[in-house]
Amino acid sequence: MRTAAVPLIAAAIALGASPAIAQEREQVKVAFEHALPNVEGKRIVAVTVTYPPGAKSLAHHHAASAFIYAYVLSGTIRSQVGDEPAKIYHAGESFYEMPGSHHRVSENASDKESASLLAVFVVDSKDGPLTTPDKAPGSQ
């Protein structure tokens, strides 16, 4: 079976076919999570989001109670929240999202360098998930 595949692969290469390359997605890691002892019913969650060159997040919204402060750790991030125009943020800059916001664009603005940010959520203890991707058009 292995030898039978070799001529097929060679034919595909000769005809100019190339293997499909899946675009890398962002990587999200929880840095910490803790109940806020002086604010009953609230918790703080910090996540790092790392984008390979050219990577982007799907349009999404966050938990309804989530206030989010984002700080760009490295690279350049393009972000569009709600109906505001998209903005570019560089390492050392920050932005925030109000509860209930729709995050239309969140992506690495560079196709050559990676980018990362720290997102700090203040959210109701029982509210979740933190992020929900929009449904694709035509899906149910």
Label each residue range with its predicted role.
Residues 7-16:
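Bacterial N-terminal signal peptides
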Residues 36-41, 51-53, 83-100:
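Short acidic-glycine-tyrosine-enriched beta hairpin
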Residues 130-140:
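Short, low-complexity, Pro/Ser/Thr/Gly-rich segments in the mature regions of secreted, periplasmic
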Residues 78, 85-86, 100-127:
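Ligand-binding loop in jelly-roll beta-barrel domains
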Residues 65-84, 91-93:
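Glycine- and acidic-residue-biased ligand/ion/polar-headgroup-sensing regions
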Residues 41-46, 64-67, 84, 100, ...:
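Extracytoplasmic
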Residues 18-24:
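Sec/Tat signal peptide C-region and signal peptidase I cleavage site
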Residues 25-59, 65, 120:
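A short glycine-rich, His/Asp/Glu-containing loop-to-beta-strand
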